[in-house]
Curated annotation (Swiss-Prot):
It comes from Oryza sativa subsp. indica (Rice). Belongs to the glycoside-pentoside-hexuronide (GPH) cation symporter transporter (TC 2.A.2.4) family. It holds the Pfam family MFS_1. One of its GO terms (cellular component) is plasma membrane. Pathway: Glycan biosynthesis; sucrose metabolism. Coiled coil: none annotated. The keyword Transmembrane applies. GO terms for molecular function: arbutin transmembrane transporter activity; maltose:proton symporter activity; salicin transmembrane transporter activity; sucrose:proton symporter activity. This is Sucrose transport protein SUT5. InterPro entries: MFS, MFS_trans_sf, Suc_symporter_pln. Keywords: Cell membrane, Membrane, Sugar transport, Symport, Transmembrane, Transmembrane helix, Transport.
Length: 535
């Protein structure tokens, strides 16, 4: 009897998070009607036309991912040109985990209950896209704004010192950008589930979403690797904004254009059915109740789920050095550039950053290809073996990056002739190969942990909402740890990226062992890898 009562309590607790992130059964019926009637068209509409319309209704995901790719590849290096030291760059990224943990659940809660005539999801997509456009313009023009707020009037081609006003403007824009990204992505993904619920099914909707994210990533990294924006549009250059800064402006101008176009297409084609006020589920107690119920559910998680959370946390600890410093490593260790050095040094650094963006493009391609293979591998080898192998591969690739960085810097001295600056062709080629290969374990990172968590919670009576909620905690906490400790570690090793990659490789090796020992045997996997990692 006691076991039965305990099982009831656990089932209720596990269902709590899911209940807060979904609507009543009548709403699910409306979702199916909406999919059949709006995007799907009438009964006479061909299946091909329905799927094409559904495809373009998700176009906003590509526009958002384009901007996210620019953020990942260009903003850590750019922040250092404004005077933010290498050891404090990680602190500018601390808003990511905060936004992912706080904004997404709250936006998801209220988008499920929105009764505007535009629909449940489109109001949040519209507002989020507008904030993203404003944010990227603030970032792109931060140097010019800082000059008007009191920064040096010396020309950017000769000035090598900090520009603190510009740095503060940049940080404000960066934080707004992260919060806006999280405002859009949750409702956009939920809308695809709404619109595909009838004719196509949720797997088709999520596949289209992932495909648009892949397209956005490839185009974004191509834009970041382009060093011709300042030549095509000379007016981008100002006394406060030289070549590298002007290239950043040009890339972000295209981001605004793509976001506006993709948002307009989505707003037009995704004809949502408005939600009636009487159908709104008001039993949750408000958006903040999401977090209360989530933490209550932690008390009744199955033991296997705690092991999944631990392995997930260590896995993400191994990845953050690469995610934050990938293009900076290419600019510093491989190209021997300096973001706040002389004009020649800054140009070399910028060339390395753009080469790193090209490497991230290769990474995205490898990620997309690998995502199609992962389900078969998981069914054949089990998910935990695939997860473990991916961590050992990260360990090997991080070791190669450490070795390449050390070899590149060993014979280099800044005081030597200018002919020694720039990359060694062989080392540059190896670095690009590493960037491409790391897309393979990244595909595992963005799919397998979610699938394992979903299976473990489902076996104990929980749901997808519970799995996503608790797994977010395991991702957010290590991000905060890295953001707060990366500075002191960086200072202890004289501002290089190589030690950070060494630490990441050590965590990857530990996680590879833990995955084999701790994780349960599961063979399922999510439908497609998510191209955008982290928060």
């Amino acid at each position: 009897m006691e076991e039965g009562r305990r099982g009831d309590r656990e089932a209720k607790s596990a269902a709590g998070w899911t209940a807060l992130s979904t609507t009543k059964t009548t709403l699910e019926e409306k979702r199916r009607l909406q999919a059949n009637g709006s995007v799907g068209g009438d009964a006479g509409t061909s299946g091909f036309r329905r799927i094409v319309r559904l495809f373009f209704a998700c176009m906003v995901a590509g526009g958002i991912q384009y901007g996210w790719a620019l953020q990942l590849s260009l903003l850590s290096p750019y922040s250092q040109t404004l005077g933010i030291s290498h050891s404090y760059v990680s602190l500018t990224w601390i808003c990511g985990p905060i936004a992912g943990f706080v904004v997404q659940p709250i936006v998801g809660y209220y988008s499920d209950r929105c009764t505007m005539k535009m629909g449940r999801r489109r109001p949040f997509i519209l507002v989020g896209c507008l904030i993203i456009c404003i944010s990227v313009m603030i970032i792109g023009f931060s140097a010019d704004i800082g000059r008007h707020l009191g920064d040096t009037k010396e020309h950017c081609s000769t000035y090598t010192g900090p520009r603190w006003s510009a740095a503060m403007v940049y940080i404000v824009g960066f934080w707004f950008l992260d919060f806006a990204n999280n405002t859009v992505q949750g409702p956009a993904r939920a809308m695809m589930a709404d619109l595909s619920a009838g004719h196509h099914g949720p797997n088709v909707g999520q596949s289209i979403f992932s495909l648009w994210m892949a397209i956005g990533s490839v185009l974004g990294y191509l834009s970041g690797a382009n060093g011709k924006w300042h030549e095509w549009f000379p007016w981008l250059k100002t006394a406060a904004c030289c070549d590298a800064c002007a290239n950043l402006k040009g890339a972000f101008f295209t981001a605004v254009l793509l976001i506006v176009v993709s948002m307009t297409v989505t707003m037009y084609l995704a004809d949502e059915m408005p939600l009636d006020k009487q159908d709104v589920d008001t039993s949750g107690g408000g958006g903040c109740a999401v977090f209360v119920d989530l933490f209550k559910s932690l008390r009744n998680l199955p033991p296997a789920m705690f092991k999944v959370l631990a392995v997930t946390a260590v896995t993400w600890l191994s990845w953050f050095p690469f995610i934050q410093y990938n293009t900076d490593w290419m600019g510093r260790e491989i190209y021997h550039g300096e973001p706040q050095g002389t004009a020649a040094k800054a140009d070399v650094y910028d060339a390395g950053v753009r080469e790193g963006a090209m490497g991230l493009l290769f990474c995205s391609v490898a990620l997309g290809v690998t995502s199609f293979v992962i389900p078969k591998l998981c069914r054949r080898l089990t998910s935990k073996v695939v997860w473990s192998i991916s961590n050992f591969l990260v360990f090997a690739l991080m070791a190669v990056m450490v070795a390449v960085g050390m070899v590149s810097m060993r014979g280099y001295r800044p005081s030597l002739a200018a002919g020694l600056t720039g990359p060694d062709p062989t080392l540059k080629a190896v670095a690009l190969v590493v960037f491409a290969l790391i897309g393979i374990p990244q595909a595992v990172l963005f799919s397998v942990p979610w699938a394992v968590a979903s299976e473990v919670t489902a076996e104990e009576g929980g749901g997808q909402g519970l799995a996503i909620g608790v797994l977010n905690i395991a991702i957010v906490v290590p991000q905060l740890v890295i953001a707060l400790t990366a500075g002191p570690i960086d200072g202890a090793f004289n501002k290089g990226n190589t030690p950070a990659f060494g630490i990441g490789g050590a965590f990857a090796f530990i996680c590879g062992v833990l995955a084999l020992i701790w994780l349960p045997k599961t063979r399922g996997v999510s439908n497609a890898a998510v191209v955008a990692g982290g928060h």
